[in-house]
Amino acid sequence: MKKATVGAAVIGAATVCAVAALIVNHRMRKSSKWARAMAILREFEEKCGTPDAKLKQVADAMTVEMHAGLASEGGSKLKMLITYVDNLPTGDEAGVFYALDLGGTNFRVLRVQLGGKDGGIVHQEFAEASIPPNLMVGTSEALFDYIAAELAKFVNEEGEKFQQPPGKQRELGFTFSFPVMQTSINSGTIMRWTKGFSIDDAVGQDVVGELAKAMKRKGVDMRVSALVNDTVGTLAGGKYTHNDVAVAVILGTGTNAAYVERVQAIPKWHGPVPKSGEMVINMEWGNFRSSHLPLTQYDHALDTNSLNPGDQIFEKMTSGMYLGEILRRVLLRVAEEAGIFGDEVPPKLKSPFVLRTPDMSAMHHDASSDLRVVGDKLKDILEISNTSLKTRRLVIELCNIVATRGARLAAAGVLGILKKMGRDTPRQGGLEKTVVAMDGGLYEHYTEYRMCLENTLKELLGDELATSIVFEHSNDGSGIGAALLAASNSMYLEDKS
C-alpha cells in the first residue's frame, strides 16, 4: 500500500513537472517570438530614420534636381513642367466663371461668382457626374460629348443673375489630371491616359480643342481660358486669399508640388518674358529620387511589384496610396517570423493594398485605454481577432514609424523648394513671409502626419526663419482654383482696364 502511494506521488510529481515544463517552454517560445517582433520593429525604425542631417541632404538633392529639370527637358527625374501660368489671381477678379474638373471616373462642373476687390467668393455651386465605363475606353468624341452635355445642362439650369451680357462668352478653367504636354495657358496635348481610361484616338490631340469641339456640338457658348492640373489650381486658390502664397503641395492619394519661379531662372524657357517676370512650375515631385532617401526592403518590394517600377519613388514613401501598404508589408513579416497573430499567418494580411491609409490613420490616432480602434480595424479588415494590448501597441508603433518618415520627407521636399527660391535664409531688410498652400486628404485628415510635417520644417529652418513660413489649407484647388485661373486669364481683362 505504501509502495502504491509512493508510486502515485511520484507519477503526480512527474505530471506536475511535465506541465510546468510545458508552461515554461510555452512562455519561452512566446517570449522568443515577441523578442523577434521587437527586433523587426527596431530594425525597421532604424532603416526609416530621418535625422535632421539626412533631411537636409534630401532637401539639397531636391534643389539640385530642380535646377537640372529647369535647364533642359529630360535633364532630371523632376519634370519641372512649364505651366504657362504667369498671371495668378490677385483678389481683384470679378464676375462669374466656371470650372470643369476631370480627374478620374467622376467629374465636376463648378460656377463661381467673384466679388472683386475685397469681395471674395460671393457664390459657388457645383454638379457632379460619373463617367460610364464604356466611355472610358471609347472614342474622344463620345467622352467629350458626354461631358459637354452635362456642362450644357448645368448652364441651362442657372438663374437669370448668372446670365452673360449679349456677345460675351462664359469662361472656363479646365482641370485635366492626366499626362499632358502643355503648349499654352489654354492648350495641351494628351500624352497618355491613366486611372482606367484608354481612349486611343485622343492621344496626341489638344485636350482643349477636343472639349471645344464637343461644346460647339452641344450648343455651349463657352471658352476655355486656362488648362491646369490640381496642384497649380491649389496654388491659384491659395494666392487668391493669401497674396504671400508662392508654393503649393498636394498630399493625398498621390503627391505633387508647384511653385512660382523667376523666368530668368528657367533656361529651357525660350518664349517671351511675361509682364510678371514669373512662371508657375509644376514639379511632378512624386518622381524625385535620391540616394539619401531612407529606402527599406519593404519599399523596394512595393516598388518592384508596382505598375511603374523605378518611378514615383518619393510618392511611394510619402503619399496616401502607399503608407498603409508599407504598414501591411511590415506586419506580414512580423506575422511570418514572430507569429504575433497566431501560428498561422492571417490570409487577408497577404492581400496587397487591403490596409488603406485612412485605416492606418484611425489606428494611429486611437487614444482609448484598450486601443479598441486598433483591435476593431485588425478584426474588420484583416480578420485578426483577440489581439492583445501589447500587440495593438506594436501596431501603433509601426504606424508612427511609417507616418513619421513620410511626413519628415515631405517637409524636406518643401525645404528643397524654399532653398531653390532663396527663401531658406533671411534676406536683407528682414524676413519675407512665404505661405505654402496645402491640399489633399492625407494632409487634411491625418493629423499626426500633418503636425509632424509642419514641426519638422520648423526644426529644419530654425526658430527665427520658421516664423516667416506658414502652411495654409487651400481646399478644393482642383475646382475653385481652376475657375480663378479662368478669371485671371480672362480675355475680357483688357476691356475692364
From Swiss-Prot:
Residues 90-228 are annotated as: Hexokinase small subdomain. D-glucose binds at T194, K195, N229, D230, N256, E284, E315. The keyword 4Fe-4S does not apply. The chain crosses the membrane at residues 4-24. Keywords: ATP-binding, Chloroplast, Glycolysis, Kinase, Membrane, Nucleotide-binding, Plastid, Plastid outer membrane, Transferase, Transmembrane, Transmembrane helix. Gene3D superfamilies: 3.30.420.40, 3.40.367.20. Its main location: plastid. Residues 35-487 form the Hexokinase domain. It is found in: Plastid, Chloroplast outer membrane. Residues 229-476 are annotated as: Hexokinase large subdomain. Coiled coil: none annotated. GO terms for molecular function: ATP binding; D-glucose binding; fructokinase activity; glucokinase activity. One of its GO terms (biological process) is intracellular glucose homeostasis. InterPro entries: ATPase_NBD, Hexokinase, Hexokinase_BS, Hexokinase_C, Hexokinase_N. Its EC number is 2.7.1.1. It comes from the Eukaryota. ADP binds at G104, T105, N106, T253, G441. It catalyses: a D-hexose + ATP = a D-hexose 6-phosphate + ADP + H(+); D-fructose + ATP = D-fructose 6-phosphate + ADP + H(+); D-glucose + ATP = D-glucose 6-phosphate + ADP + H(+). It is a single-pass membrane protein. Pathway: Carbohydrate metabolism; hexose metabolism; Carbohydrate degradation; glycolysis; D-glyceraldehyde 3-phosphate and glycerone phosphate from D-glucose: step 1/4. The keyword Kinase applies. It is an enzyme of class 2 (transferase). Fructose and glucose phosphorylating enzyme. Belongs to the hexokinase family. PANTHER family: HEXOKINASE, HEXOKINASE-1. This is Hexokinase-1. The lineage of its organism: Eukaryota, Viridiplantae, Streptophyta, Embryophyta, Tracheophyta. The gene is HXK1.
